[in-house]
Amino acid sequence: NGIAVILDVALNHAFGRNPMDRMWMNDPDGDGWGSPSVENPYFNFSAMHSYNVGNDFNHQQPRTKNYVKRVIKQWIEEYKIDGFRWDLSKGFTQNCPAAVAGGQDNCTNTYQQDRVDVLKEYADYSWSLDPTHYVIFEHLGTNTEEQQWANYKIAETPSKGVMMWGNMNANYNELLMGYSANIAGMTSQSRGFTANRLMGYAESHDEERLMYKNLQYGNTTNPAYNVKNLDIALSRMSAIGAVSLLVPGPKMIWQFAELGFDK
């Protein structure tokens, strides 16, 4: 019916019941649950980036790369999935251990060549199976690094390039609450992308609801237009469409945001 089906895939980590963890894990109490051992050929003993949940995959390991490609192949060839949204793509580096000079958080948020290379490799493999496959990264990093993917193979036919999540929550918060805000970052051009590969959004599962903040912190300077008023706050939420969906390029829309969902 012309509707693309896109999966959210978390290939940066797995949890302790994963068989690739359980075959090489620390399990002193013998309950079948533990963290990866130093011998594990898939997982890092400790996370190599600052936003880890679960157990951190080592994407420089050939076995891990083979596993990821098998997952990609299964979904594309068997289920004809149209694209993947890759969770936490910042986690695909081996360069940022806890004791790294300058701090793990700073390292994770700066340009890492190993991460650029391995994610291009996975994108290439996806496109080799389906040249029209949608590749989307939840990276939320520097423009310099994101440009490496957004502009990658953009001139090919069909045009490729990775779509990058664009978190504009703070800016839209200020705008919707009735304060001065700059939402220029919603455009691909503002980030140095050659084509429209920014998937901008005002709200996601990771932030407080915009509607909640309208009611709690909205601008009350003008008594005739008090943003804390429910009807006014709701009207501002519906305006999200007018000020974001018309910006060229793909968008991510959080469930019922335009109707004032605040739970």
PLM features: residue spans?
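Substrate-binding/active-site clefts of carbohydrate-active enzymes
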Residues: 1-111, 122-130
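Conserved alpha/beta catalytic core and glycan-binding cleft of carbohydrate-active enzymes
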Residues: 80, 106, 112-262
